[in-house]
Amino acid sequence: MIRPLRNLVSVLASRSRLPQIEVALGAGADALVVRVLEPLLPPDVELLREFAARHGVRIYLQPGGPETASPMLEADETDLYYALPEFDLRIQFSPTEFTQVNPAVNSLLVRRALALLDPQPGERIADMFCGVGNFTLAIARSGATVLGVEGSEALVRRAALNAELNGLAASVSF
C-alpha cells in the first residue's frame, strides 16, 4: 500500500497541503485518514476516489482535529471493526481511535493478559485506559464485572456501544 500511496500523493495538486495520512486496518475494510489543510481541488478528490476504488480502502478527510475526520463517500460511513474470536467479540472503531496496529499481536496480547489475570465470574475488575473496550469486554466475557476507565469521552461512548453490541452492557460500566 505504501508504494501506490506514494505514487498517488506525488500527482496530487494539493500534496503540499496534506501533512499526514494515517492508516487504519479493520477486519472488513481499511481506511486512510488524509489530513487536509485546505479544501481539496476537484481533480484531487477524483484521484482519491479512484485510488479508494482500486485499492479497496475508505478515504476520510480530516480538516481539523481527530473529531473532524469524515468519510469522503456516504457508503463508507459504517465503522471499522476487528474481531477477537476466542472471546466472541467484534469491536467497532473509527479510523482515528486508537487500536493495536497488528491484529495478531493484539489477539495474543489479550489472550496472555487474560490468562495471567484469570478473571472469574463474580469478580470486580477495573480496566484503566480502556479505550474502545479491547480488554474490558474480554474480561467481561469471562463473567467478571468490569469498570472501564478512560479519559476520552468519545472512547467511553465507543466502549459502551461495543459492550452493548456484544451483549455485555450488564457486565460493564464506564
Residue ranges: model-predicted function:
Residues M1-L18, E22, A29:
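Extended interfacial segments that mediate partner engagement and assembly in macromolecular machines
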Residues V11, P39-F174:
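Rossmann-like S-adenosyl-L-methionine
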Residues A24-L37:
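Short glycine-rich, basic-tinged beta-strand/loop micro-motifs
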